[in-house]
A protein has these predicted regions:
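A short, flexible beta-alpha/helix-coil linker loop
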Residues: 15-17, 107-108, 168-171
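A generic beta-sheet turn/junction motif
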Residues: 5, 52-54, 155
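Intrinsically disordered, low-complexity polar/acidic regions
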Residues: 110-111, 142
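Beta-hairpin "wing" of winged helix-turn-helix
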Residues: 1-5, 9
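A structural signal for short hydrophobic beta-strand segments in well-ordered beta-sheet cores
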Residues: 1, 48-49, 151
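Cysteine/selenocysteine-centered motifs that mediate thiol-based redox chemistry or coordinate metal-sulfur cofactors
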Residues: 105-106, 187-193
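Extended hydrophobic
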Residues: 117-189
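Amphipathic alpha-helical effector-binding/dimerization core
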Residues: 9-104
Length: 193
């Protein structure tokens, strides 16, 4: 509500959610079965998150049995500099788009482990591209880790979403490579559907 004239208007948050709903139409339906299979195999919570401008919107999750205190849930928005889902999307942005995003640094921190500087994020982009996945090591929630892989549009070659899985940080760190391989297999299955 605009208090000066008494009129109501929608905030930008509503527009972002509308955009996220639009991008999460039926083309993401094959991801649901993939996510449930990943969760059944790992016990971790898996997430499908869609890029919306300079943010990431979680559109689906398959709840694991280990942790129920994760920040990322359907409808929630996270920045691209925090968490495996956001940072993998940032890493696979075109260079010019990534640089535009990085111009907003330093970014707000969730805790002392959040990557907030241009230097930290550029190094993370390099590492993420090198290994093919982003690793969240308690950078959003203490005690929680995650691995995220990109989902790239087959036609444009641009990153449009990410598939990630999270759980207790020790388990994530110990299984990060096999978890990343499982997530990449999931992305291939989603894209083939």
């Amino acid at each position: 509500m605009d208090w000066s004239d008494g009129n109501y208007s929608l905030s930008l948050d509503w527009l972002r959610l509308a955009d996220a709903a639009r991008t999460s139409r039926t083309e993401w339906q094959p991801a649901i079965a993939v996510m449930h299979a990943i969760t059944a195999q790992t016990g971790m919570t898996s997430f499908l998150s869609v890029v919306s401008g300079t943010e990431l919107v979680c559109v689906e999750c398959a709840q694991g049995h280990a942790i129920d205190s994760l920040i990322l849930r359907p409808g929630r928005v996270l920045p691209l500099h925090a968490g495996a889902a956001g940072r993998v999307a940032l890493a696979y942005f075109e260079d010019a788009d990534a640089e535009r995003y990085l111009a907003g640094a330093p970014f707000p921190a969730y805790n002392e482990n959040t990557l907030v500087s241009v230097e930290q994020l550029r190094e993370d982009i390099r590492l993420t591209r090198e290994r093919g996945y982003a690793l969240s090591d308690e950078d959003v929630t203490l005690g929680v880790g995650a691995v995220g892989v990109p989902i790239v549009d087959n036609e444009s070659g641009r990153v449009i979403a990410s598939l990630s899985a999270g759980g207790f940080v020790d388990e994530v760190l110990a299984t990060q490579e096999s978890l990343a391989a499982l997530l990449h297999d999931g992305v291939h299955e989603i894209q083939a559907a």
